[in-house]
Protein backbone atom coordinates (compact mmCIF):
# COMPACT_ATOMS: atom_id res chain seq x y z
CA UNK A 1 0.00 0.00 0.00
CA UNK A 2 2.97 2.32 0.55
CA UNK A 3 3.54 4.61 -2.37
CA UNK A 4 -0.10 4.54 -3.46
CA UNK A 5 -0.81 7.85 -1.80
CA UNK A 6 0.21 10.42 -4.36
CA UNK A 7 -0.90 14.01 -4.42
CA UNK A 8 -0.90 16.65 -7.10
CA UNK A 9 2.85 16.21 -7.44
CA UNK A 10 2.75 12.42 -7.91
CA UNK A 11 5.56 10.38 -6.43
CA UNK A 12 7.27 13.47 -5.01
CA UNK A 13 4.24 14.21 -2.83
CA UNK A 14 4.07 10.59 -1.65
CA UNK A 15 7.70 10.80 -0.45
CA UNK A 16 6.48 13.24 2.22
CA UNK A 17 4.00 10.67 3.57
CA UNK A 18 4.72 7.73 5.88
CA UNK A 19 4.40 4.16 4.63
CA UNK A 20 0.95 2.67 5.24
CA UNK A 21 1.31 -0.75 6.87
CA UNK A 22 -2.42 -1.32 7.42
CA UNK A 23 -5.83 0.35 7.45
CA UNK A 24 -8.99 -0.42 9.42
CA UNK A 25 -12.32 1.37 9.03
CA UNK A 26 -15.53 1.19 11.07
CA UNK A 27 -18.31 3.70 10.49
CA UNK A 28 -16.80 7.19 10.64
CA UNK A 29 -13.52 6.00 12.18
CA UNK A 30 -10.23 4.99 10.56
CA UNK A 31 -7.06 3.52 12.00
CA UNK A 32 -3.81 3.62 10.05
CA UNK A 33 -0.66 1.67 10.94
CA UNK A 34 2.20 3.86 9.70
CA UNK A 35 5.98 3.97 9.57
CA UNK A 36 8.13 6.94 8.64
CA UNK A 37 11.27 6.16 6.64
CA UNK A 38 14.79 6.92 7.82
CA UNK A 39 15.44 9.12 4.77
CA UNK A 40 12.00 10.77 4.59
CA UNK A 41 12.33 14.37 3.32
CA UNK A 42 10.00 15.56 6.08
CA UNK A 43 13.02 15.42 8.45
CA UNK A 44 15.21 17.60 6.22
CA UNK A 45 16.52 20.50 8.32
CA UNK A 46 14.33 19.61 11.33
CA UNK A 47 16.93 19.25 12.98
CA UNK A 48 20.37 18.35 11.56
CA UNK A 49 21.74 16.60 14.68
CA UNK A 50 18.43 15.21 15.95
CA UNK A 51 15.79 14.62 13.25
CA UNK A 52 12.31 15.25 14.70
CA UNK A 53 9.00 14.82 12.92
CA UNK A 54 7.48 18.32 12.55
CA UNK A 55 4.10 18.78 14.21
CA UNK A 56 2.69 20.34 11.06
CA UNK A 57 3.40 17.05 9.24
CA UNK A 58 1.26 15.18 11.76
CA UNK A 59 -1.62 17.61 11.16
CA UNK A 60 -1.20 17.33 7.41
CA UNK A 61 -1.10 13.52 7.46
CA UNK A 62 -4.29 13.27 9.52
CA UNK A 63 -6.09 15.36 6.89
CA UNK A 64 -4.56 13.54 3.91
CA UNK A 65 -5.23 10.01 5.14
CA UNK A 66 -8.76 10.86 6.26
CA UNK A 67 -9.56 12.45 2.90
CA UNK A 68 -7.98 9.66 0.85
CA UNK A 69 -9.76 6.83 2.61
CA UNK A 70 -13.10 8.52 3.33
CA UNK A 71 -13.52 10.22 -0.05
CA UNK A 72 -14.37 13.47 1.76
CA UNK A 73 -13.27 16.42 -0.42
CA UNK A 74 -13.41 19.06 2.33
CA UNK A 75 -10.30 20.95 3.39
CA UNK A 76 -8.93 21.92 6.80
CA UNK A 77 -10.08 25.35 7.97
CA UNK A 78 -8.72 25.22 11.49
CA UNK A 79 -7.20 23.23 14.34
CA UNK A 80 -8.37 22.87 17.95
CA UNK A 81 -7.14 21.21 21.12
CA UNK A 82 -3.76 20.39 19.63
CA UNK A 83 -1.28 18.70 21.95
CA UNK A 84 2.11 17.23 21.07
CA UNK A 85 3.23 14.73 23.69
CA UNK A 86 6.21 12.84 22.29
CA UNK A 87 9.12 13.41 19.91
CA UNK A 88 9.06 11.14 16.84
CA UNK A 89 12.14 10.27 14.83
CA UNK A 90 13.02 8.48 11.59
CA UNK A 91 12.13 4.80 11.24
CA UNK A 92 9.50 4.80 13.97
CA UNK A 93 6.16 2.98 13.74
CA UNK A 94 2.95 4.48 15.00
CA UNK A 95 -0.80 4.43 14.61
CA UNK A 96 -3.06 7.27 13.50
CA UNK A 97 -6.71 7.07 14.54
CA UNK A 98 -9.19 9.50 12.98
CA UNK A 99 -12.86 9.88 13.84
CA UNK A 100 -15.36 12.22 12.23
CA UNK A 101 -17.52 13.76 14.96
CA UNK A 102 -20.36 16.14 14.36
CA UNK A 103 -20.34 17.07 10.72
CA UNK A 104 -17.13 19.05 10.54
CA UNK A 105 -14.74 17.86 13.28
CA UNK A 106 -12.07 15.27 12.62
CA UNK A 107 -10.57 14.08 15.90
CA UNK A 108 -7.15 12.45 15.61
CA UNK A 109 -4.74 10.61 17.89
CA UNK A 110 -1.23 9.41 17.07
CA UNK A 111 0.03 6.56 19.26
CA UNK A 112 3.59 5.21 19.11
CA UNK A 113 4.14 1.47 18.68
CA UNK A 114 5.13 1.31 22.37
CA UNK A 115 1.66 2.59 23.34
CA UNK A 116 2.70 6.14 24.26
CA UNK A 117 0.55 8.94 22.87
CA UNK A 118 2.39 11.18 20.39
CA UNK A 119 -0.20 13.86 19.64
CA UNK A 120 -3.91 14.62 19.66
CA UNK A 121 -6.15 17.27 18.19
CA UNK A 122 -9.14 18.21 16.09
CA UNK A 123 -9.19 19.36 12.49
CA UNK A 124 -12.12 21.58 11.50
CA UNK A 125 -13.33 20.85 7.98
CA UNK A 126 -15.02 23.06 5.40
CA UNK A 127 -16.03 22.63 1.75
CA UNK A 128 -13.29 23.12 -0.84
CA UNK A 129 -13.53 26.67 -2.18
CA UNK A 130 -10.79 26.87 -4.80
CA UNK A 131 -10.68 24.55 -7.78
CA UNK A 132 -7.34 22.88 -8.40
CA UNK A 133 -6.03 23.24 -4.83
CA UNK A 134 -5.29 19.85 -3.30
CA UNK A 135 -4.87 19.42 0.45
CA UNK A 136 -2.41 16.55 -0.06
CA UNK A 137 0.28 18.61 -1.80
CA UNK A 138 3.18 18.77 0.66
CA UNK A 139 5.01 20.92 1.42
CA UNK A 140 2.81 23.91 0.66
CA UNK A 141 3.99 25.60 -2.51
CA UNK A 142 6.08 22.59 -3.56
CA UNK A 143 5.95 21.81 -7.26
CA UNK A 144 7.16 18.81 -9.18
CA UNK A 145 10.83 18.96 -10.08
CA UNK A 146 11.96 20.98 -7.06
Residue ranges and their predicted role:
Residues 34-36, 84, 125:
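Hydrophobic residues in beta-strands and at strand termini
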Residues 1-15:
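Polybasic, low-complexity association/targeting segments
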Residues 17, 90-94, 117:
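Residues that act as N-cap/strand-start positions at coil-to-secondary-structure junctions
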Residues 11-51:
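Catalytic strand-loop segment that frames the active site of acyl-thioester-processing enzymes
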Residues 18-19, 25-30, 99-146:
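HotDog/MaoC-like acyl-thioester-processing domains
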Residues 60-97:
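Hydrophobic beta-strand-centered segment that forms part of the acyl-chain substrate-binding groove
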Residues 14-16, 75, 91, 103:
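Short solvent-exposed loop/turn micro-motifs enriched in small/polar/acidic residues
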Amino acid sequence: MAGNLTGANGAEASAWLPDVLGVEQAGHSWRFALQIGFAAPVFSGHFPDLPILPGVAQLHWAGVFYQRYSGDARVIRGVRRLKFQRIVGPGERFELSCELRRSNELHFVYVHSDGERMSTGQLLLQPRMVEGVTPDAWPPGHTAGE
